[in-house]
Amino acid sequence: MNRITYFKHSFFLICIILGCSSFAQNYIPFTPRFDQDVRGDIILIGNNILGPNNEAFNENSVYNHNVDMRYVDIDNDISTYSSSSADLEIPNPNCYQIIYAGLYWGAVTGGSESITEVQLKGPTGVYNDVTGTVIYNADDNITGNSFPYSCYADVTDIISNLENDLGTYTVANVSSAQGETSSFDPYNGTGYSAGWSLFIVYEDPTMPGKSITSFDGFSAISSSVNLDVPVSGFRTVPEPAPVRANFAFAALEGDKPIRNDLMLINDVNLSTIDRPANNFFNSSVTRLDATVVTNRNPNSTNTLGFDTGVMVVPNPNN
């Protein structure tokens, strides 16, 4: 791990999209996507795009394989087949500039539509066509009950050209299979889930400097074995200065009722009030202060297998 730094404070980000499989494996290594020293910060917003209907789903004891999953489509636009939204807010709205925006989307199993073509609408204007790069597409490469994919697109130019870049962002046409998989023959206990995350880096000259690095890749996790996901290439401050790190993520197939799914960084078990140590991936959208994000549509407490959020990484020995 490099230890070169130019700033007093260091900020570490990983943007992960995880899948599910009958066995654990690192399919696509995590490599840097964005790496820059910034006086500013990051924000991650997102939402799921599957559910029984367009309403918020708040039955927290339900597994997604027992739900007849259909596209959420909240935009009242007949040209889209799926859509959901989330609001972008910046703490100091009078002194900032967005310098990078990366859009991620994926599903446990893709639908019949294109997985690389989605649409993004900001607080002002109309939908913009977005063509993504495939991070991973299982297609027929693995066996089991799911064939996950994940895609990425740099949407900085789209957001930079908006008249107003704070407010509601809507992502449409994320492709996913649909149905209640527990009723399939043969039985499928995995279920379907899908969603999107928008990762924002912004400058604010009143804030301390940070080294911000984002990584993406694809790892499939299972309930039968632990999986180590190696990540390297980020910078930290030299000793003895304390390292302060945050961790951003997106994941698929983290049913809220399923316990004992853990996330550890350097053997430190991550947890917050809304992400317990024994149920880290719990179908929720959370922010840095560990609370659930409510300014999204639909505003579900159970996102039926989709997780995204940001949290502080505990570093008690430094």
Predicted regions and their residues:
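Primarily extracytoplasmic ectodomains and periplasmic/lumenal surface modules that are beta-strand-rich
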Residues: 93-100, 105-113, 125-127
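Helix-biased "structured C-terminal domain" signature
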Residues: 28-43, 48, 194-318
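Bacterial Sec-dependent N-terminal signal peptides
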Residues: 1-27
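Extracellular beta-rich ligand/substrate-recognition surface
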Residues: 62-83, 142-149, 217-225, 252-254
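A short beta-strand-loop element at or near the start of a globular domain
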Residues: 55-100, 171
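Cysteine-clustered segments with highest specificity for TGF-beta superfamily mature ligands
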Residues: 123-189, 276-318
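Solvent-exposed beta-hairpin/edge-strand motifs
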Residues: 110-130, 263-268
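Residues within well-ordered beta-strands of beta-sheet-rich folds
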Residues: 87-89, 97-104, 119, 152-154, ...
